[in-house]
Amino acid sequence: MSNLKQKDSKPEVAVTKSVKTYKKSIEYVNSDASDIEEDINRAEDEYASSSGFVNFLRDFKKRYGEYYSNNEIRRAAETRWNEMSFRHRCQYSAEPLDTFHVEPNSVSSLQRSSEGEHRMHSEISGCADTFFGAGGSNSCTPRKENKCSKPRVRKSCPKPRAKTSKQRRSCGKPKPKGARPRKACPRPRKKMECGKAKAKPRCLKPKSSKPKCSM
């Protein structure tokens, strides 16, 4: 009977241990989830106006909160934030210059991304952005400053040209080749002066019809 009692008592101890460990794991998960929620809420309250990641995390939580747990949604938001470009991140910040100046104790997920983001912010004047599909590269060369150039001379207004009236061609028959051009104004003809009246010829005397005597 003693052996049977000992055998019966062993599984009871195992069951109680498993129940205790299960309760502890549930309490640990709940405490971890509650701590994450408290950290997020505290960060949202303190850095809602300055931190762009907190605003992005709030938006990401509203959209995809049903598909992720509290621990997974922070990691998913962090990976998505690291893939975003600088201009896209500035859309979630009220002050774009202070996007990367977030205290390390506010949100633990910003520790890895803050270093690269701060370097991008210091070299933003010469870096190529991938927001519009441009090729991104780690090596950024600063832009060359433009030298002092000569002032451009403004173009003066063009002088008005004299309008020439073009002669319109008439729809007449084409002139034959080699035709003499007509003078525009013909010369006036000289008027003939009135001449003196010619003298009439005198009437000759009639010859005598009588024959002369021959000797």
Swiss-Prot record:
Protein name as catalogued: Histone-like protein 18C
Leader peptide range in chain numbering: none
Known function: Not known. Encoded in the intron of cAMP-dependent protein kinase regulatory chain type I.
GO terms for biological process, alphabetical: sperm DNA condensation
Cellular component per GO, a single term: chromatin
Annotated region (Disordered), positions in chain: 140-215
Biased composition (Basic residues): 149-190, 197-215
